[in-house]
Amino acid sequence: VAPLRGGYAFQSNQYANEGIPIVRISNILSDGSVGGEFVFHNELKDDEIFMLENGDIVLAMSGATTGKVSILSSEKSCKYYQNQRVGLFSKTATCNYSFVATIVRSEKFLEQLRDVLVAGAQPNVSAKDIDAFDFSVPKDVEEQSQIGNFFRTLDRLITLYQKKIDSSKEMKKILLKNMLI
């Protein structure tokens, strides 16, 4: 669907207290976002080959969270560095990026991922494995865009309703606690 680009092997002894945040596997969160505690690196020259930007789709390629997909979205920084074993789904002219986000969160993607993961001490997946996955993709980029936007809207609605459900549960808990005093 979109070629997967690997990251850069930053050395931990070169981390800084501030600078460009590095997206590591631990920053790819299960809720589909990128966050948590970042480490930083001083800005490097010619960093385009491992730079990430808001809206980029990343994939954990090693460890217990292999296959976890997140979308980089932050107001704090407009530039991030991509650590080794964090894959970036590259943007192409023939594939709408919203559609890519839908595909990589699909059951079909997860099925193919499970097929290539080798059981062992640490699961790993390669860019070559991911690039070989097979999907039915409309040739028309506008159609891809409509599909991607539809599912993005649906995901937002699900998130909104989940927040309302969580809020209602909390209110119920408080009311029951106060009622039984």
Which residue ranges define each predicted feature?
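Feature detects amphipathic, helix-rich regulatory segments
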Residues: V1-I181
